[in-house]
From Swiss-Prot:
Subcellular location: Mitochondrion intermembrane space
Lineage: Eukaryota, Amoebozoa, Evosea, Eumycetozoa, Dictyostelia
Highest taxon in the source lineage: Eukaryota
Role summary: Major role in the synthesis of nucleoside triphosphates other than ATP. The ATP gamma phosphate is transferred to the NDP beta phosphate via a ping-pong mechanism, using a phosphorylated active-site intermediate.
Catalysed reactions, semicolon-separated: a 2'-deoxyribonucleoside 5'-diphosphate + ATP = a 2'-deoxyribonucleoside 5'-triphosphate + ADP; a ribonucleoside 5'-diphosphate + ATP = a ribonucleoside 5'-triphosphate + ADP
UniProt keyword annotations, A-Z: ATP-binding, Kinase, Magnesium, Metal-binding, Mitochondrion, Nucleotide metabolism, Nucleotide-binding, Phosphoprotein, Transferase, Transit peptide
Protein name as catalogued: Nucleoside diphosphate kinase, mitochondrial
């Protein structure tokens, strides 16, 4: 049934009904009170199109920073300004979801220089630190938490080397970076870093502890 819907979807988009729907959404963005609802609805609809099953129930037993070494291990991933400016958000999220990792937290914000400095505090002695903070706080960043078995290590493999020119073909940085100094994405490099970064960017009530009805890692 889903495949039939997927084939029909382009026709639906081309129809007058879809145009009226998108026009309504466009008007709604003019109303500040509608923005949060529309952003949430867009994320929900995108996930529904991308998967054949959805949320079953809430799993309240997982702490904010996850459980390293288990199926509920968590990693912090940030899509940087250079990616949001190039409209690569969906492409990057898809890489993690196709690998079977579960998105449990997401927000879009422009970090303050203070927040950016705290995020990169382990690099504060480096000569490039001030430039890094300035760039990271210069525009919209998509902050995310992904959950799954070995997500920290595997996430780093998906991302590629810090220097995009040294990244392997097929990694996010090799495929999508166009400038070495702007490597488009950040990912936790250890369970300790993940715990620190998740707590820095997210509160308990901003994480959705949901359980998939078609689990990949839930029972492993």
């Amino acid at each position: 049934m889903f495949s039939r819907f997927a084939r029909a979807f382009p026709k639906i988009l081309a129809s007058g009904a879809s145009q009226r729907t998108f026009a309504t959404v466009q008007k709604a963005f003019a109303n500040p009170t509608s923005k949060k609802l529309i952003v949430g609805s867009s994320l929900l609809i995108g996930s529904a199109f991308a998967t054949t099953s959805f949320v079953a129930c809430e799993n309240k037993s997982v702490p904010l920073v996850g459980l390293p070494g288990t199926n509920q291990e968590r990693s912090f991933i940030a899509i940087k300004v250079s990616s949001t400016q190039r409209r690569l958000i969906g492409e990057i999220i898809a890489r993690f979801e196709k690998k079977g990792f579960k998105l449990v937290g997401i927000k879009i914000l422009v970090p303050t220089p203070e927040h950016a400095a705290k995020h990169y505090e382990d690099l504060n002695k480096k000569p490039f630190f001030n430039g890094l903070v300035k760039f990271f706080s210069s525009g919209a960043v998509v902050a995310m938490v992904f959950e799954g078995k070995d997500v920290v290590r595997t996430g780093r493999v998906l991302i590629g080397a810090t220097d995009p020119s040294q990244s392997a073909p097929g990694t996010i940085r090799f495929d999508l970076c166009i400038e070495t100094g702007r490597n488009i994405i950040h990912g936790s490099d250890s369970n300790e870093s993940a715990a620190h970064e998740i707590a820095l960017w997210f509160k308990e009530d901003e994480i959705a502890n949901w359980v998939s009805t078609n689990p990949v890692y839930e029972k492993m």
